[in-house]
Amino acid sequence: LPEKPLVASIPIALPRPDGKPGNAVAGFVCPLETDKSDPKHRVQTINAVTSRTKKQLHGMSLKALNQFSFMGVAPLMLSQMAGIGKVIPPLFNLVVSNVVAPQKKLYLKGSELEALYPISLLFDGYALNVTIVGYSDKVAMGFVGCRAATPSLQRLAVYTGEALEELETSIFE
């Protein structure tokens, strides 16, 4: 196991606190507990951190949300613009996002949309983006990675499936 946990940047969309249409976008970082061997402990800790942070963000004004988001994004954007992204330590190791899609089945000219597969982007100096999308009764995960840092995304996808099975077994046994 690694000495320090991987840290994920998690973007989220929140209802606008001012009641206007659209979303307020924010984000936070969360340790993924990859330095711990117990998968159940990992999930419990991640759930506690994400639940607590989302609750705090839901209570913020739109101005506070914007300032909070800017504080998190500013170092990333400045390092990208100045070209020093490889010199300063990263704020996080990967991005993990969840895209909310319709839960009812969609059709186009009578043909059913069977699945949605997510794709996302990478910033310079960051090696991996994992995006999860739920549609109807299915969940799909998309992996976008830097070839030099993550040479086999296919293996990562397979290992992720195996880890999810292990996690399910440990939680529901």
Give each language-model segment a name.
Residues E3, K20-N23, Y107:
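Short glycine/proline-enriched turns and hinge-like loops at secondary-structure junctions
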Residues L1-D18:
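Hydrophobic "lid/gating" helix adjacent to the active-site nucleophile
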Residues K20-P102:
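Helical lid/core segments from catalytic subdomains that handle acyl or acyl-like groups
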Residues L14, G27-C30, V130-G134:
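Short beta-strand elements
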